[in-house]
UniProtKB/Swiss-Prot annotation:
This is Poly(A) polymerase catalytic subunit. One of its GO terms (molecular function) is ATP binding. It holds the Pfam family Pox_polyA_pol_C. Polymerase that creates the 3'-poly(A) tail of mRNA's. It is an enzyme of class 2 (transferase). InterPro entries: PolyA_pol_cat_Poxvir, PolyA_pol_cat_sf, PolyA_pol_nucTrfase_Poxvir, PolyA_pol_nucTrfase_sf_Poxvir, Poxvirus_polyA_pol_cat_C, Poxvirus_polyA_pol_cat_N, Poxvirus_polyA_pol_cat_N_sf. SUPFAM superfamilies: Poly(A) polymerase catalytic subunit-like. The lineage of its organism: Viruses, Varidnaviria, Bamfordvirae, Nucleocytoviricota, Pokkesviricetes. It comes from the Viruses. It catalyses: RNA(n) + ATP = RNA(n)-3'-adenine ribonucleotide + diphosphate. The keyword Transferase applies.
Amino acid sequence: MNRNPDQNTFPNITLKIIETYLGRVPSVNEYHMLKLQARNIQKITVFNKDIFVSLVKKNKKRFFSDVDTSASEIKDRILSYFSKQTQTYNIGKLFTIIELQSVLVTTYTDILGVLTIKAPNVISSKISYNVTSMEELARDMLNSMNVAIIDKAKVMGRHNVSSLVKNVNKLMEEYLRRHNKSCICYGSYSLYLINPNIRYGDIDILQTNSRTFLIDLAFLIKFITGNNIILSKIPYLRNYMVIKDENDNHIIDSFNIRQDTMNVVPKIFIDNIYIVDPTFQLLNMIKMFSQIDRLEDLSKDPEKFNARMATMLEYVRYTHGIVFDGKRNNMPMKCIIDENNRIVTVTTKDYFSFKKCLVYLDENVLSSDILDLNADTSCDFESVTNSVYLIHDNIMYTYFSNTILLSDKGKVHEISARGLCAHILLYQMLTSGEYKQCLSDLLNSMMNRDKIPIYSHTERDKKPGRHGFINIEKDIIVF
């Protein structure tokens, strides 16, 4: 029986809050389910919608001026969403509406609304780099790694890009300046800030409040365009979310990291924006070349990779005084693979205090072995390295999420050997350890190399889990 609650049965204040919000007297079930949400509901009810409408209009004028929509349409969409609960009777949908409205009323002003007020002066901090001098070296390095054979029968997943990306990029440039303690960028846009000749698509970001930011941005886009916006979570990418429109076109994505991880990520300051240190990005690029898919990307567009690598090589030459003379010493470090147990042993004693590194290709196996070691000093850098690291009894234990390329049966390809070395160097940088000699040898080991065909490769670790999503239009949250 779905009776209305007796006014004398429930506390009048809570009942009144829920009644005002729903625009009707709640049923007994609605009251009991929603009473613990009374505080959030009250915040939503007293929220000044007129000020919010004004902020969205200002965001539209500044970042989405080319989108054909009127001020009255924006206002109608906002007021319609904030009254949606009055026509909703499903408890699950009501909870979703309350949660998303709560995010808007408590965070939008500080996260996106602030972008409409006068910005602090930009501190010009660019250094002139002679990238041209590194282009030939980068091309030589990449040419020796351009060994993937493209299977023309292989069906490649299409990455459709929304026309709104350019608007969101404009917003993100300002967002990165205003929120540079909680959000940093990497990838092509960050390198563009060093070398304006770099081409970039969307802006790659790491931040500490990814979910909240993406929800606020999704609503901004919805209110301006009227389109249904969906946020998706991918299980095999740690703390990753992406915004897509109703036609599955990519708008922006983001990785979320803890503040303590953000604090140790090496970064540099350019024009009021923090970017991941290009040295760190170069190591990540070398690491990623162990992934067969990335080598296929290199084969399709070598010049794109060349521009990026030349920029990063010039940065490390200028910043660290790296001399490119071909002296490689013990790089890449010796790597022996146990294909049955899916563990690669890297001999590290020539460079580091730990004598070897056991690189696991299955994360669950590593987690189990760490438990058996009864060690509690492991470091988890989340999506920054996509791995945990532990040093115990002079042995490093870590996980490698990419494929391992083989140049012959049981023999690790030098591309993967360098990738494993780069993975270890990422740890050294994150923990303020010694890395510069090793970095110099690693980069020099990439010079004057012949192409070595790929014999085979290991499979990537299979990640369990299901896709999650937030569908604003349908009032569904699945995580």
